[in-house]
Design a protein with these regions (language model features):
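A generic membrane alpha-helix/interface feature
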Residues: 30-32, 178, 226-228
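Gly/Pro-enriched, hydrophobic low-complexity segments
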Residues: 67, 71, 77-81, 87-115, ...
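Sequence-level motif detector for i,i+2 pairs with an aromatic at +2
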Residues: 4-6, 48, 115-117, 127-129
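Residue-level signature of transmembrane alpha-helix interfaces in integral membrane proteins
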Residues: 28, 124-125
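Gram-negative outer-membrane assembly/targeting C-terminal domains
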Residues: 214-234
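Residue-identity detector for glutamine
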Residues: 5, 26, 49, 160, ...
Length: 234
């Protein structure tokens, strides 16, 4: 869920395992909509996105970069830059539901899942939420049988997402913990992902949020994974 045509945010990731051991990650996230608009209605009808993540702390991930080209009709493209090896690694579509830098979030959680990959069913409406059941069109490509999403009626922000395994047991839950209004946009500033099977939990906190800062398309390229766009990072 994103507002504005582009944006920048600083994020602090806190990863806690089942024994209470804590690790931290700090990163800058840049995002740009690649929307085309209808000349008559001036409404976006194609909403592809590009995402750039630059890690700043701790030392073992410093200067690491993650790039996503989010597609609507084909698989997203993802790359990871490993500075210690000066290596740009393409992340296969089959790996999109694996751990993102050792956290409880998956790569796909960070970049977002394509709506066309699932069947969607409105199963309940409450005073505040639309409750939607989402079932994968290709069950063999994912580890879940379905996921249930609670979408806030006023902001359309998913406040909770529950994932169910092939046996129908809930095993992951994502929560929106805090929403602030920034530049007139309702913005998630704290979120979590909990793995009920492993006992791990990751919290993401977002600050220094800025919208419509004029990001250029060329930033979202392999070149800038090696040579980060400093003017937008600090």
């Amino acid at each position: 869920y994103y507002e504005g045509q582009d944006g920048r945010v600083r994020s602090e990731m806190t990863i806690t395992d089942d024994k209470g051991r804590v690790r931290h990650r700090q990163m800058i996230i840049l995002r740009k909509d690649m929307s085309e608009t209808d000349a008559l209605e001036n409404n976006a009808y194609r909403d592809e996105q590009k995402l750039y993540v630059y890690f700043i702390h701790p030392a073992d991930v410093n200067k690491m970069g993650f790039l996503v080209w989010k597609k609507l009709t084909t698989d997203d493209e993802r790359w990871l830059y490993l500075p210690a090896l000066d290596l740009i690694k393409r992340i296969a579509a089959t790996d999109k539901r694996t751990s993102f830098v050792g956290s409880d979030f998956y790569y796909e959680d960070i970049s977002g899942r394509n709506v066309d990959e699932d069947h969607h069913e409105l199963i309940e409406t409450t005073d505040n939420y639309y409750i939607i059941k989402n079932t994968p069109k290709d069950p063999s490509s994912v580890e879940f049988s379905n996921y249930k999403m609670y979408v806030h009626k006023e902001t359309y922000i998913p406040v909770q997402v529950e994932y169910y395994d092939k046996k129908g047991n809930q095993y992951r839950v994502a929560k929106t913990l805090k929403v602030d209004t920034i530049q007139g946009h309702p913005t998630v500033t704290k979120a979590s992902m909990e793995n009920l099977k492993t006992g791990g939990k990751t919290v993401m906190e977002y600050d220094e949020v800025k919208y419509d800062i004029g990001l250029t398309d060329d930033i979202f390229s392999e070149r800038y994974l090696r040579n980060p766009p400093q003017q937008f990072l600090y």
